[in-house]
Amino acid sequence: MKKIIYLAVLLLIQTTFNNAVMAQENNPVLVPLPSVDDFTEGEDGWALGLGIGIEYESAYEGSDEFGFEAQPAGAVQWRSGDNIYYFAGEAIGWRGLLNDNWLVGALIGFEEGREESDSDDGRLDGLGNQEEGFELVLQARRSFTPDWRYWLVSRVVASDEGNLALFGVGRRFGEQTDGTGSEVNLVFVVHDSDYANKGFGINAIQSLSSGLEETKLSGGLRSFGIDYNYRENLNSDWQIYGEALFEYFSSEVRDSPIARSNFEAEVGIGVIYKF
């Protein structure tokens, strides 16, 4: 039932914004940002990019253990004017331009759970496994310049296990306007108590089973972060990309026994073939 509700919300949002979209010149990409996949080359209709990436990342939120993981890359996309509908891995969504300065979008994504076995050192023993689920993500960027050199970014994540919001500023580097080059975003993240305790809380039963102190977090500041994205066309078909993320947790999160590290980090690189 929740999947149906999320899909209905997604379609309603798209329909509402679609009426407000302004006609624009035919550009190779919707916006010239390396973090935004666009394989349509400015043409309406279907587009496909498939590839693979390798990530070196924290084993779980707050972990001091790291490991490599292979991830699929790319997406199936369908473009209609200033709107792109897409299916990418574990997410289905839409993004569109309201005008020259506003990029908005919505998606339904798959949220991975957490298992005790995620920690090779047994740091999660006794905490139990968390089920996988779905989340609704609403996103918006507001550019300060016509060429998307500087912008504000916001994102809201809603699920039945809590809510999270991100706000920040970004900058694009390089003179390209085809979606290649690099960009950086500086952000801060807030969460409600449900979302905070999902990742870092310990209830009475978990405390008895794990030996860790019972912990209950309140809502508020979660972290400060910086992320970097890079994209380059090797030729007309092949594309490489890279990304890096660093997130420094707030004092309340750092005080949780689950947070074995004060930060979360991730580095990834991959290759995509555009059909």
Regions found by a protein language model. Give the residues of each.
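Predominantly the C-terminal beta-signal and adjacent terminal strand-loop region
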Residues: 61, 229-275
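Outer-membrane beta-barrel "beta-signal"
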Residues: 71-76, 169, 188, 262-275
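Strand-connecting loop/turn motifs
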Residues: 43-47, 81, 99-101, 143-149, ...
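Cleavable N-terminal export/targeting peptides
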Residues: 1-44, 63
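Membrane-spanning beta-strands of outer-membrane beta-barrel proteins
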Residues: 45, 67-69, 133, 162-164, ...
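Transmembrane beta-barrel domains of outer membrane proteins
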Residues: 53-55, 75-77, 95, 137-143, ...
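Transmembrane beta-strand segments of Gram-negative outer membrane beta-barrel proteins
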Residues: 40-56, 100-110
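Outer-membrane pore/translocation modules
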Residues: 25-27, 84-185, 190-218, 252-253, ...
